[in-house]
Amino acid sequence: MNYFNVEYPDLCGTTRMWVQRYEKKRNYHSKNKYFLSNGHELRINSLSLQKKKKYMEKTVCILAGARPNFIKVSPLVRAIGKNPEARCMLVYAGCEDDPTLEPSLFDDLQMPRPQYYLGVSSTSLNEITSQVMGAFDRFLDEHPVDVVIVVDDLASTMAAAIVTKKRGIRLAHLVAGTRSFNINMPKEINRLVIDALSDYLFTAGVRSTGIANREQSENSQTFMVGNILMDTLRFNYSRFRRPTSLPDLLEGSYIVFTLNRKALIADTDNLALMLQAMTEAAGPVPIIAPLRGLARDTVQKLGTSVQIIEPLSYLEFGWLTAHAKGVITDSGNVSEEATFNGVPCITLNNYTEHQETVSVGSNVLVGEDAEKLRSAVSQMVSGEWKKCALPDRWDGRTAERIVQILLA
């Protein structure tokens, strides 16, 4: 008995169904007779079937839960689009009019906009989880897929992972094995759940690979594919452009400051001390901060000399960080970009899920300690910074490896 995967039209459109080919069974001697799982005969020309088998597309669904996810999956979307054996369905958990998705984002990344939007909008993590589970389940009712790829550690990511696994669909986690080892963090819970459910654990570095290998279930596989963010940076580096709002900015003469972490923003007394230490240590070196929302409002109210500007496009922000004297951030992605660019970076946290940026790269952790921040900024301004290198597999071929694994 031989099995082939063919496309068969039914009431829901074109779907994939397993058919069984019987050669010399009872009174059936024709090699062109096939039977569906329900026993009905299906006649297909054998040559046509061989072609379908050879060129059968695998449908890969990528779910993005927030703006940073698109930056990571853009090379994967392009890689799948170039492969005749795969088809990509890009889904966004949010709304089509999400203000964080600036009009230029998808053009900057040279990727298509999502074909589907789940329309979820809430500030409650538990509500996001439940809404995404319901919406994604309905989406899969109407759109059969072979594998679902989820990214990072958001509530929407975890929700989609649960729905995928309950449906028996293959699940892949991009940037698996990252840990803070703080179970009180919602994102840490998300990571643990997603990794435990995933069939494919795609890791970025040696440390995350070790964690994934230790924790993986017997039915999952870990692949150290590399850092997908580096694919995006390498693809776009020559396309970075100077921000139009900063025409006179001199390369290497400024510090970039980003702020997003809610806990850090909420403690305004300590944040005020940190901002004061940062600006005093920087001296005449300007600190440029492309901030939005609550972070912008809070820093403005504290009345510092930080130069707050409007949020930048992806290509403009890439130029700003690549040509900075240094970067101060609470973002893991920004610290990775700084290491790639060889730019000194200070992370406002006691830990990082991207340990390679500290052990090999240009990143230093100062926590939320104003005096540690003051000391680190002084070293940054004076040029007294450690030497750094690129971690293993930051070579821009991560998306290529992932597609090869999924289609093997």
Region spans (language model):
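Serine residues within intrinsically disordered or low-complexity segments
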Residues: 30, 37, 46-48
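Nucleotide-activated sugar donor-binding and catalytic core shared by glycosyltransferases
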Residues: 56-285, 294-408
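Cationic, low-complexity basic patches in intrinsically disordered or flexible, solvent-exposed regions
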Residues: 8, 21, 34, 42
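Short, Lys/Arg-enriched N-terminal segments with co-localized hydrophobic residues
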Residues: 44-55
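Short terminal hydrophobic/aromatic SLiMs and anchors at protein ends
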Residues: 4, 22, 29-32
